């Protein structure tokens, strides 16, 4: 049983399974810094130099030793350092991005979210970049002089198991594919992280609603292309689109903080769905949770809320989770705003690229062509092409759903860019090729 045997009501603290905190609405994410943090874990490399200026001095010294004419250095400096193009040589150079950000803890937590999706494992079998003569020298300086030897690297321990195993597997597969194409990785890594930030947030929110149904699975989350019209007649978009997402995001802070409270003192905080599985049909948990519900109601002064003795452990846990939401519906604006502001921060920081205002239709979930192409390439992966219905299944497995109207628009988009072929006279067998 993952439930603590001594349940005590405490402050709401969120330390697991989601990177944002209640005060993060006022902050801005630095995706370059997040990218640098993830690169450090993916490549298992850490900088030994303080900043890019120190690295520039190392490169100047090395290149002047190799160049016949010192006058070449200012030209190279302008090409690579003044323009920051040095950061585009290879993914490892993005390590410098993480050193540039101030007030970096929230960016570090976002980076940790992606590392947790990897299961704490690094991907060491990444294909090398093809570099020109000068770039190879700069890369060698980075590798041989500007990075810490492995013995001196800080080793971080990631105990947290993935909350969404299905999405963690997709993330690892997609990252492995990107690692086989380092130039594409370099060009698209930030978009890749932004995409998975949205996918993780939306699927976590939806699966928190289904906490009693066992291991999470992809939940309907309907988007349209950003070039489409959003009519009110599109049932799936209306029922399983933006409004559903926002309503479910409101559960992230209450449910996850409650899950931590119920596992206080345990060596590891398990996902809520695993906590539920561990107490199912376990009578002692029922009494513990019933007593805790009354204590929580009293401590939070939820006068208008009724608490009843529940007959089984899952019903008792359901009541406790409802109380976790009720504490932010008291009419006390300061208290109620805690969860509302957390939800706004979540939408702002991790979902904004995928939301548009559409007049009378209100907010809708959208995907632009850049993200669609990236997602298409990721799903096709090591294959040369995929049949359209298999591609759509791959979208769904990652938490991206399109109705039939959007699917038709997607095929038209593929035809315009020339990466689709029809393998039968009727045109029923549509295959989509990747663009990398």
Q: Regions from the language model: what does each represent?
A:
Residues 2-210:
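An N-terminal, globular interaction/scaffold subdomain
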Residues 186-307:
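Long, internal scaffold/assembly segments composed of regular secondary structure
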Residues 284-366:
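Long, low-complexity, charged/polar intrinsically disordered regions in eukaryotic proteins
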Residues 345-371, 412-436:
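Charged low-complexity interaction tracts in eukaryotic proteins
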Residues 366-384:
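Positively charged, polyanion-binding regions of nucleic-acid-associated proteins
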Residues 384-398:
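Short acidic, hydrophobic short linear motifs in intrinsically disordered regions
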Residues 400-413:
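Short amphipathic alpha-helical interaction segments
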């Amino acid at each position: 049983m993952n439930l603590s045997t001594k349940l005590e009501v405490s402050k709401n603290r969120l330390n697991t399974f989601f990177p944002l905190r209640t005060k993060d609405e006022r902050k801005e994410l630095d995706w370059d810094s997040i990218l640098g943090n993830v690169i450090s874990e993916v490549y298992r490399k850490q900088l030994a130099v303080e900043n890019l200026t120190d690295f520039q001095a190392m490169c100047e010294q090395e290149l002047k030793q190799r160049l016949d004419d010192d006058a070449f250095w200012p030209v190279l400096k302008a090409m690579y350092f003044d323009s920051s193009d040095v950061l585009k040589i290879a993914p490892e150079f993005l390590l410098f991005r993480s050193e540039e950000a101030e007030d970096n803890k929230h960016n570090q937590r976002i980076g940790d979210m992606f590392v947790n999706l990897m299961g704490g494992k690094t991907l060491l079998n990444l294909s090398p970049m093809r570099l020109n003569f000068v770039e190879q020298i700069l890369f060698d300086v980075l590798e041989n002089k500007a990075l810490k030897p492995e013995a001196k690297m800080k080793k971080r321990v990631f105990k947290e198991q993935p909350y969404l195993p299905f999405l963690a597997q997709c993330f690892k597969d997609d990252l492995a594919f990107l690692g086989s194409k380092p130039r594409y990785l370099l060009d698209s890594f930030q978009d890749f992280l932004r995409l998975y930030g949205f996918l993780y947030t939306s699927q976590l929110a939806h699966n928190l609603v289904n906490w009693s149904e066992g291991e999470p699975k992809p939940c309907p989350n309907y988007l349209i292309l950003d070039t489409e019209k959003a009519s009110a007649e599109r049932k799936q978009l209306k029922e399983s689109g933006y409004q559903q997402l926002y309503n479910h995001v409101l559960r992230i802070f209450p449910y996850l903080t409650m899950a931590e409270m119920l596992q206080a003192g345990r060596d590891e905080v398990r996902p809520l769905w695993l906590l539920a599985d561990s107490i199912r049909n376990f009578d002692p948990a029922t009494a513990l949770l019933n007593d805790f519900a009354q204590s929580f109601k009293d401590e939070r002064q939820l006068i208008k809320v009724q608490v009843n003795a529940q007959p089984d452990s899952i019903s008792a846990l359901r009541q406790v989770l409802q109380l976790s939401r009720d504490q932010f519906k008291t009419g006390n604006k300061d208290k109620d705003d805690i969860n509302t502001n957390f939800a706004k921060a979540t939408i702002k920081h991790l979902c904004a690229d995928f939301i548009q205002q559409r007049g009378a239709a209100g907010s809708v979930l959208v995907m632009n062509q850049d993200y669609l192409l990236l997602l298409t390439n990721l799903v096709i992966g090591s294959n040369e092409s995929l049949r359209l219905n298999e591609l759509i299944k791959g979208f769904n497995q990652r938490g991206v759903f399109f109705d039939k109207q959007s699917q038709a628009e997607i095929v038209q988009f593929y035809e315009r860019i020339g990466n689709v072929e029809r393998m039968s006279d009727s045109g029923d067998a549509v295959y989509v090729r990747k663009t990398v």
